[in-house]
Amino acid sequence: FIPVIYWLIHSESRPLFWDEYSHWGIYIREMVSTHQLWTIETNAAHPDYPPGNALWQYFFTLIPGYNEGIVYLAQFVLLITPLLVLFENICRKQLLWIPAIMALLALGLSNFGHGIVSLYADHIIGVWYAGILLQGLQSHPGHPKIMGLLSMPLAVLLLIKDAGIPLVASAVAFLFLLLVY
């Protein structure tokens, strides 16, 4: 439901910030036009970034074709996905918490970095890291299989940007401490 509202509001959005023009936007455009990952010959300012965001955006643009609104929608879905953990344990008696949590998320995300209409990766890394830690706290540490499922979002963190490496290391250490203690 929320992505539909986002699409209705931001379907005509265009790049605004420097990094969207210098590399984040170029990555997805090159992937859509060549149907492969970018190489060292890319026009982007930083050809060595991992392909996580652009790969996700590419999958969104496969069927309808390239549209910057679709790219922003893909980025928004990537941004809110780890936040779904906040709604996981809400029961019927707590339904009034949903608007309150959504308001806090809207306030936090709109003031976090460049907001929700941005191709930047830094706020995506922060939200995924927070989502992984929250899911680790919410999971049952006595069940290593459940904790092991967090390896998938940890891999996403590595695919987004190189800054994910120390975050993954600290999250693994945190999850290990949860298992031990």
Go through each PLM region and give its residues.
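Membrane-interface transmembrane helices that cradle and orient dolichyl/undecaprenyl
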Residues: C91-K93, Y129-I146
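Hydrophobic, membrane-inserted alpha-helices
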Residues: Q57-Y58, A106-S110, G131-L133, L149-L154, ...
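Active-site lumenal/periplasmic loops and adjacent helix-entry segments of GT-C-fold
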Residues: Y6-L95, S118
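Membrane-interface alpha helices of multi-pass inner-membrane proteins
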Residues: I146-A173
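Aromatic-anchored segments of alpha-helical transmembrane domains
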Residues: V4-W7, L104-S110, A155-L159
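Membrane-interface helix-loop-helix junctions at transmembrane boundaries of multi-pass membrane enzymes
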Residues: F87-P99, H143-P144, Y181
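Multi-pass, polyprenyl lipid-linked donor-dependent membrane glycosyltransferases
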Residues: L73-L78, A100-L105, N111-G136
